[in-house]
Amino acid sequence: MKTKSIFPLFLLAGTLLTAACATPTAKQAGNNSLEWGQVPQQPDLSWADSVGSRQMPGNHVILSANSFGAVADSTVLSTEAIQKAIDSCAVIGGGTVVLQPGYYQTGALFIKSGVNLQLDKGVTLLASPSIHHYPEFRSRIAGIEMTWPAAVINIVNEKNASVSGEGTLDCRGKVFWDKYWEMRKEYEAKGLRWIVDYDCKRVRGILIERSSDITLKGFTLMRTGFGDVRFFTPIIAR
């Protein structure tokens, strides 16, 4: 089946949408009116039907992370237990990892090929505010390859993986934004504004890198510490 890189398509979509959002006329801008005139013609996005993941993990095996020790307690770190469930699911050929309703604190999780992490309604993953719970590895930050903390959810060098459901991924990123703005004040005073973006290490929400047929569906992603969903290197999809 012919494949395409969705990264250039994202850029094309952004260009089309920007072009469609016409700026107000001088008359409109001058009277501070909320009337923006005629609605601009919407761009043709029919091409979007031909891109995206070609499949979701199909194995019907369901593993509960609670059986591996995950605890619905926001004060208890359940990273290891949830990761064990994901890894075990991948070993047996893939399937779905679920959690009982509740709040689970977690550090970096790595979704494997063939695995669907299902966040059902009533399930909330609370990202740990400690940067030490996110191991560092080589990644791309604002166009530069460097060592950076893992995201809360990572899908790297994998195929046919997904995160789905009606639950919530709360990244609780305020601690990282507070750190950034404090460092930025110091760096700006030294004329080094641009460097703070690389020196202030923060945790991203979701990282997808060098992977294919990845699905993110249904769940709520909120309060990220640095970027919501990041795609790096072309992601191959139909």
Task: Show which residues each predicted segment covers.
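Extracellular "leader-to-stem" segments immediately downstream of a signal peptide or signal-anchor
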Residues: K2-P8, L16, C21-V98, Y103-N116, ...
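Active-site pocket-lining segments that scaffold enzyme catalytic pockets across diverse folds
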Residues: K217-L221, D228
